[in-house]
Amino acid sequence: MSDSANSSCIIIAIAGASASGKSLIASTVHRELRDQVGSDDISIISEDCYYKDQSHLDFATRTQTNYDHPNSMDRDLLLEHLRALKAGKSVDIPQYSYVEHTRMKEVTHFTPKKVIILEGILLLTDERVRNELSLSLFVDAPLDICFIRRLKRDMEERGRSLESVIEQYRKTVRPMFLQFIEPSKQYADIIIPRGGKNRIAINMLKAQILHLLGRK
């Protein structure tokens, strides 16, 4: 938890392995807190939106992107947006296409919120990002379970082949988790075991957010 966090804009980061349950926790907290916080005052931002633009590269080169390495992220833009939102300014968040392996032309106009939930695998690897957070969490789920979830997701939602998902996991996903993502767990204020269906952890997170807002 950063001392520099602005109490008028609470930024919660949920990090962890790919397919560990980050998005499920974020969406559950968002859905269940809307009535208490206000539906227009809590929202989610995915770190995936801040993958670097690769439109200057040919498609074959883009398909080789290591999405699990910190260098794949446009950290400067993410920081610029977080600081702008904390200052009460709106931002235009880029959208990323995993089909084209680059940013889309469309952006999402995002207005300041009382509570912003960030979710992504690499959020805690950058000290500058950590310094902008009000609270940080790491979802700790077994890697074999994460792989099964990722395999199902990538084949069903992203049209990937079984072979390509396995190859990516072997070459980049698992090695980068061990090198960058798992070590970043030490920076989390809260570690959530058992993935995205940990009801006790979700309730604790909701209570902490309300506490940060000065509500019971």
Swiss-Prot record:
Keywords: ATP-binding, Cytoplasm, Kinase, Nucleotide-binding, Transferase. GO terms for biological process: CTP salvage; UMP salvage. Pfam families: PRK. ATP binds at residues 16-23. It is found in: Cytoplasm. GO terms for cellular component: cytoplasm. GO terms for molecular function: ATP binding; cytidine kinase activity; uridine kinase activity. Its EC number is 2.7.1.48. Pathway: Pyrimidine metabolism; CTP biosynthesis via salvage pathway; CTP from cytidine: step 1/3; Pyrimidine metabolism; UMP biosynthesis via salvage pathway; UMP from uridine: step 1/1. Belongs to the uridine kinase family. NCBIfam families: PRK05480.1, udk. This is Uridine kinase.
